[in-house]
């Protein structure tokens, strides 16, 4: 009986670890932020225009947050 209980406990622990690793599958991969969806790329490299176009690190200036037309 003790062996069965230990086996079930190990199985439950294994399933918990597997489900915890699956939880990270919803997040976009790092390469998707740089190359994938263009809106994600804009969000990552946008610059508000109140900086008067003085954007750092080659960012683009967007008048309406990150989704507006490039200035």
Swiss-Prot record:
One of its GO terms (cellular component) is extracellular region. InterPro entries: Neurotoxin_3_Anemonia, Neurotoxin_3_sf. Pfam families: ATX_III (PF08098). It is found in: Secreted; Nematocyst. Disulfide bonds join 46-61, 47-55, 49-66. GO terms for molecular function: sodium channel inhibitor activity; toxin activity. Residues 21-41 form a propeptide. Residues 1-20 form the signal peptide. Keywords: Disulfide bond, Ion channel impairing toxin, Nematocyst, Neurotoxin, Secreted, Signal, Toxin, Voltage-gated sodium channel impairing toxin. Belongs to the sea anemone short toxin (type III) family. Voltage-gated sodium channel (Nav) inhibitor. 1 uM completely inhibits insect voltage-gated sodium channel inactivation (DmNav1 from D.melanogaster). This is Delta-actitoxin-Avd2b 2. It comes from Anemonia viridis.
